[in-house]
Swiss-Prot record:
Domain annotation Helicase C-terminal: ranges: 323-472
Principal location: nucleus
Catalytic activity: ATP + H2O = ADP + phosphate + H(+)
Sequence motif: Q motif, positions: 104-112
Protein family membership: Belongs to the DEAD box helicase family. DDX5/DBP2 subfamily.
Role played: ATP-dependent RNA helicase required for 60S ribosomal subunit synthesis. Involved in efficient pre-rRNA processing, predominantly at site A3, which is necessary for the normal formation of 25S and 5.8S rRNAs.
Entry keyword Nucleotide-binding: yes
Organism superkingdom: Eukaryota
Entry GO terms, CC: nucleolus; preribosome, large subunit precursor
Record's protein name: ATP-dependent RNA helicase dbp3
Binding residues for ATP: 129-136
First-level EC class: hydrolase
Subcellular location(s) per record: Nucleus, Nucleolus
Amino acid sequence: MGKRVSHNEGADRRPKKKAKNEKPEKETMESPAADVTVDFGSKSDATYVQSQVLSDMPQSEIDQFLATHSIKVTDTSDAPAVRPIISFSHLPSCDSKLYSSLSSFASPTPIQSATWPLLFAGRDVIGIAETGSGKTLAFGLPCLKKILDSGKIKFKNARPAAVIISPTRELAMQIYDQISKYAGSIGIKATCIFGGVKKDEQREALKSAAIVVATPGRLKDLQNDGSVDLGKVKYLVLDEADRMLDKGFEQDIKDIISSTPDSKRQTVMFTATWPPSVRDLAATFMTSAVTVTIGGDPSADPRANTRIKQTVEVVQSHDKEYRLVQLLSENQRGAAALDKVLVFCLYKKEAMRVERLLRNKNFKVAGIHGDLNQHERFKSLDAFKSGAATVLVATDVAARGLDIPSVKLVINVTFPLTVEDYVHRIGRTGRAGAEGRAITLFTETDKAQSGALINVLKAAKQEVPQELLKFGTTVKKKQHGAYGAFFKEADSGKSATKIVFDD
């Protein structure tokens, strides 16, 4: 028999103010001292049974796993602690068809290992991890198991059991593609809702969907016209929460959440960063949430994936496109001819010009930027994923969230507006444990970013070229000449402005 773990924190599980002598936050993931069986009260009926093999594992092995993968789990409640699910064999019992697709993976990723036991146990969870960390399956598997355990997998009247909110249509489609594979194997229907297409087919799909993956703007629209009722939602996910706030969707998110049942809802938030604006949002709708952090301090300076070899070349502005053609020619020949290369530009017009240039040079190229319609964007992404195009020219609309497998190289033709965007861009390579490469063409125009870039390079133990050091190591205030001090923490007391072009 395994250990049965769940939690009872009373009817009111809202965060409480810290008392003077309150004990400090505890880092969890040690094993409970004895078998514990407690129900969740009104919040959830979830019960998690920890595998006996996992329970018998020496604590030293658990500690080593947490340290090796830089996993920190912080829980301020008195709930029993649970151990990370290190192997798929440690998963709680469920329909074997749900787990069968996992055989293609060697083991859970760190974010999956740490969040699965908590989510299976019905806890509210905040996951802080880099993109490409396996978070879709981290929140997706517990979601599907929760629906299976409820005994109801057929739904009608547009009353879904689970809602997953994503900042962009591309990311929503990507999540849907992964979730639907697992859901379909056990007879659960999922649908994807986003802007830029007609609503009629979406309304029809909503009628029988158990899981809705959606962008906030379109979901809010369909709510307003009565096409979907969120009153039965028991599992709510906010993916890329920091990015949704950046894009001005805070009020839409709050409106959507307020229409779901607080007393029965399990809430999950995933974010790459942890600024005050995201913390404030979490505090308004999550109860006694456990925070799982993979890597360093998310509120500190941005850090690049250490598996990515970063190269910075200081060039003249007028030489950038010539150098880009050289780099592609050097990196797409012989055995590497089919390697996927992601090329980033700063503006739409620049991206369109670079795409035309590369096409004229006979590269197999596709593009993705804000001027393309829905069909054109999906067509470009599909071409790149399938290998029909080996070069994808993108603006920052593709910098975060998009899961494009096997990108070997990222080339930054123009440095982004912030070093955070730089880290997100190059994070398209070196995913799922693979090695990656990133080459950045840096010009005198970008010199205000030199100090921050040097810090990122040093933190990842990468070579810093002397030409870059000449621009200085001072970290400037986060602002851009054309946009001013646009990069400010969101004021949680003010309503955000919705940007509609990407939803």
